[in-house]
């Protein structure tokens, strides 16, 4: 695992925490792990990508890599939740811009949603898992994957 991200699958929820935008090698590794865990679990994963509040804004190349990750991740994941942590203007703008891009590119098909914190993901996880996700989120917090 790269020191530039942390990743763990709890139940069938894949948590990935990025303190900075992932590199090409990171994206390749995450996609390989998605495939491996998808095969191990036997069902599509529920992806929760956590973007640290102090993460730098991705440049054009990094945005393309993130787009590739989400596009290819559809092969292994039922849904992708992108949590952009923080209350600063930069964090709010990132959430608004990504939400706007989903609409502009007409990819608003329910696969990707943008959140401010991991707690706002809980209702969807509960629906998809058919059980209370609180222990899963608690474990992710204990592992430093969520705040």
Which residues does each predicted region cover?
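Amphipathic, Lys/Arg-enriched alpha-helical "gate/interface" segment within cytosolic domains
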Residues: 2-147
């Amino acid at each position: 695992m790269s020191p530039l991200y942390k990743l763990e699958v709890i139940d069938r929820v894949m948590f990935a925490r990025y303190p900075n935008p992932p590199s090409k090698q990171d994206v390749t590794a995450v996609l390989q792990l998605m495939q491996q865990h998808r095969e191990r679990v036997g069902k599509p994963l529920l992806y929760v990508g956590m973007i640290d509040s102090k993460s730098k804004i991705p440049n054009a190349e990094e945005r393309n890599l993130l787009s590739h990750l989400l596009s290819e991740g559809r092969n292994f994941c039922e849904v992708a939740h992108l949590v952009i942590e923080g209350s600063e203007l930069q964090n709010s703008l990132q959430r608004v811009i990504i939400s706007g891009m989903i609409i502009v590119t007409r990819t608003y098909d329910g696969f990707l949603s943008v959140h401010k914190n991991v707690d706002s993901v809980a209702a969807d996880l509960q629906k998809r898992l058919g059980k209370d996700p609180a222990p899963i989120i608690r474990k992710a917090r204990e592992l430093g994957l969520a705040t």
